[in-house]
Amino acid sequence: VGGIAGYSKAMEMWKINKTVEGYSYLTQGLMEHIDKLRTLQPNNDGTKYYLGDTIKELNLVPEGWSLQSGRLFTTSGSVATVFSRNNRLVYDVELGNYHYDDNIIISDSFSTKLCQELMNKFAKPLHSSLQYAWIFKTQSTVKYYYGDSLCSNRNNCIINMTLSDIQNACNSCITNNEFCLLVFEF
């Protein structure tokens, strides 16, 4: 039994690491075009310009991922929607399944491990490129972390995130009565 549990845990970590690696690959490719991508939707009206077709044309879909209806499905089961909005390149990352209950979106599952790894191994090293890394929540307070260009004494800065900060932020999405989304804005 211990061997099976160990194997299962190792496979989960392998999938998570492959997912983080995939986001890094995608981001490295998109950063080469960041100035153009940001201006695809220059209005500050919140309108989104979806980049699924652009990602496919640039051959940036990470190995093992699939692109369906403009959304990226990862090796770990998370789903990312990438778009330009308000002069920013934005990733909306769903870390689990969800459903609607009386027109309210509720997470059925939320991978705190993947959330923690993305914040620690993806967002934190990109502190100088990111403007924001945050967790959108439908029912409670949003937690923002700011990139270097917006970092100040009054803000929570990505570069200063501790493992405890990351765990607390990601663990806040374990409840079953709301929907959480990890958001990265470049």
Kindly give the residue locations of the regions a language model identified.
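C-terminal juxtamembrane segment of a hydrophobic transmembrane alpha-helix
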Residues: 1-14
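N-terminal alpha-helical signal peptides/signal-anchor transmembrane segments
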Residues: 7-10, 23-41
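Structured segments of extracytoplasmic/periplasmic soluble domains
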Residues: 13, 29, 33, 121-129
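Extended interaction regions within the primary functional domain
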Residues: 32-44, 50-53, 130-131, 138-149
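Extended amphipathic alpha-helical segments with heptad-repeat/coiled-coil character used for oligomerization
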Residues: 41-67, 72
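Intrinsically disordered, low-complexity regions enriched in Pro/Ser/Thr/Gly and acidic residues
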Residues: 63-186
